[in-house]
Amino acid sequence: MTGGQRWEDHALAHLTAAGLVLERRNHRCRLGEIDLVMREGETLVAVEVRYRRGASHGGAAASVTRAKQRRLALAMRHYLMGWRGPLPRVRFDVVALSGPAERPSVEWLRAAFDAPGSG
């Protein structure tokens, strides 16, 4: 298991315990990647998972740059191209893990950002 998979597993456990349902893991396209695509009620949630051992440079959440946000939005647009039926509402969340790898703390930032260009 890679480090990224390990942190995604932590995030997935946290989100499913909160009632979200996994739709897809690691949606990749040439435009970007979404770590976890989850569903919360009628809302589709694109989740970016980040881990940082310490808080230097702003910590895990701060590492989701504007460029990364744009790539996530493009990857979600690609994901929705295959959607059947009315398009769902979409939200972009970040799960930031930090601290010791054995027991990282989890910070879930709901609606961490809007899709660039959406207002």
Residue ranges with predicted function:
Residues 26, 50, 93-95:
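Solvent-exposed beta-strand sheet faces enriched in polar/charged residues
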Residues 34-56, 72:
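Conserved catalytic cores of phosphodiester-cleaving nucleases, focusing on short active-site segments
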Residues 22-24, 46, 92:
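Hydrophobic residues on conserved beta-strands that form the core of alpha/beta folds
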Residues 15, 72, 92:
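Residue-level signal for inorganic ion chemistry
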Residues 53-76, 82:
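Mg2+/Mn2+-dependent nuclease catalytic core
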Residues 30-32, 102:
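Short acidic/glycine-enriched loop/turn segments that link adjacent beta-strands
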Residues 82-119:
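Domain-level recognition of nuclease-like catalytic cores that cleave nucleotide substrates
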Residues 1-25:
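Acidic-basic catalytic patches of nuclease active cores, encompassing PD-(D/E)XK
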